[in-house]
Amino acid sequence: KTYSDTPVIAMSYTNSFINPSAEHIATKLSECGFNGVLIVDLPASEKSIINSFKDKQLNLVQLIAPTTELSFIEDYIENDPALIYYITQRGITGSNNLNLVEISEKLGEIKKLSNKPVVTGFGIKTVEDVENLKTLTDGIVIGSPIVEKISLDPSLTELKKYVEPIVEAIKA
């Protein structure tokens, strides 16, 4: 926080956030300057865990998948997340099966229920993907391709070549 105003979010599984207790972890994260949590496998019904983080002014990032039913989306939104992260595809991250019709429909459903920002991620890796999604979403997350470029070229030359046209597509 000394050098940047960029929000910092802790991401892990529920088990990591409840041992020794959600209250303890929330306190420690808050003391360290974290702004929020993304708990990948946390059901919306776990109000006590969610409230432990909210009590320490830690924002919730809520994951919603293509298979999430409308009633569960409503439950997630009831938890008042700071941000909704829509998973754009079924399967594993980094695969090639974006269904733009399905993504558009689901994002429309989510935006009817909430005015919170919605970012999309999982499977997004090309300039074409970005061009197709940028008007549908409030933000785009590109993970696996960036991690791959960094691991193959620590000098970051390949990463720069990869990211520059994507940034241009977002700005266009």
Locate predicted features.
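Active-site-adjacent beta->alpha loops and helix N-cap segments on the catalytic face
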Residues: 1, 17-22, 39-56, 69-74, ...
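Active-site beta->alpha loop and helix N-cap motifs at the rims of alpha/beta catalytic domains
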Residues: 1-42, 136, 161, 168-170
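Hydrophobic faces of well-ordered beta-strands that scaffold small-molecule active sites
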Residues: 8-12, 37-39, 59-64, 84-86, ...
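Catalytic cores of alpha/beta
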Residues: 23-24, 68-79, 120, 124-140
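Conserved, mostly hydrophobic/aromatic
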Residues: 29, 76, 133, 143, ...
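Glycine-enriched alpha-helix->loop->beta-strand junction motifs that scaffold or abut catalytic
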Residues: 29-35, 54-61, 78-84, 135-139
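Catalytic-face loop-and-helix region of soluble metabolic enzyme cores
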Residues: 87-97, 109-129, 141, 145, ...
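C-terminal helical cap(s) of enzyme catalytic domains, especially alpha/beta-barrels
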Residues: 145-172
